[in-house]
């Protein structure tokens, strides 16, 4: 498990196809097993490999907001580890706009987890030092790119229904998501 910077806070990366690495991440964060994890991909063209279907309106959202702080929740491909999806059958996906996060995903050549680099219910970390103070030597590495901007977390929208369901308000306003979705409704 590796800590890395994003356009908001530091995140934790584990290979999204590695059941044991995902388990280690859950233990490290002390995250409840019933809370699923999101993934970062390098390119929207990779979506087909990790999800079941892409609603046309979701393509408008990816074109407008990716890379950036919008996580879209899709029906997960059946080959994904069940501990990644918390057995929900759904997976959150996004593309980070941070160059280090993008380089990490490209270098790994597969999706990585996208969860905040902190213990569950603890404040999000903006620096490598904050990550060390919360997670210490339990990490394999920290990709230190200095202070992240912080601010609002990513917005999470479930696009498996007729209209998107906003699961978490963050850097992108709900109205922006709905307006973009309705372009092709």
State what each model feature region is.
Residues 1-185:
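Active-site-adjacent structural elements in enzyme catalytic cores
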